Amino acid sequence: MNDMNLFEAMYSQRSFTRFRPDPVPKEAIDKMIDAAIRAPNGGNRQPWEFIAITDPEVIAQVGGVYKDVWLNAMGHEAPPDETPAYKAARYLANHMPEVPAMILICAVHDGAAPTAPSSQDEPFVRGSQASSVWPVAQNLFLAARALGLGTRLTTAHLRGEQRVKDILGIPDHVETVMLTPLGYPRGNFGPTQRKPAVEVTSYNRYGNRVT
């Protein structure tokens, strides 16, 4: 578990769909989550809950829901023109029940915030609480990268969210937001390929590119 320069982690972080069967140490999971909760969040309410899934039987159940809803939505047979990105996603869907570990990040909706006391503000509050989970997820992924672990941001389980909540005993006021498989990857980290930042950056007015 070596520390890594932040920019090195950011520039070499990748999404993985293939993992070695090696178990993920609890110490690594705990360190990742401890780093994740340092993220900024609305009103410092820290409206999150993490469910680390390491029991193979539970992984198989949750992964089975993921596989089922993904294939039902995208088709059980790959089309001849399926892109590499979708091929990777299909591979993960088929093998999600077998990944070494998973982490489910949830948003806890515990009522209106002091700044939004009325019932009409509830959608705003719920949105704020759910939005606070996304910086946490990125922290989690960067911590995993620093520890040599692979992750992938997925939300397909939401098509079968109640089934996942039933498996894991998640109460009604807790919303599942994203699920990541976790493991030592088959494949190499980075560099990632993206559009140049200058193509998506404006200064002072939309569309004003400064090179």
Regions from the PLM with identified roles:
Residues 47-48, 99-102, 177:
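Short, surface-exposed beta-edge/turn micro-motifs
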Residues 36, 103, 109, 118-166:
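Small-aliphatic-rich amphipathic alpha-helix that forms the alpha element of a beta-alpha
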Residues 18-19, 49, 150-154:
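Short catalytic-loop micro-motif centered on adjacent basic/acidic residues
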Residues 37-44:
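Glycine-rich phosphate/pyrophosphate-binding beta-alpha loops
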Residues 52-132:
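Glycine/small-residue-rich phosphate/adenosyl-binding loop
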Residues 1-34:
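Short acidic N-proximal helix/loop "leader" segments that mark the beginning
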Residues 91-94, 166-170:
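A generic local secondary-structure boundary/capping motif
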Residues 9, 15-16, 176-211:
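C-terminal helix-cap and adjacent tail motif
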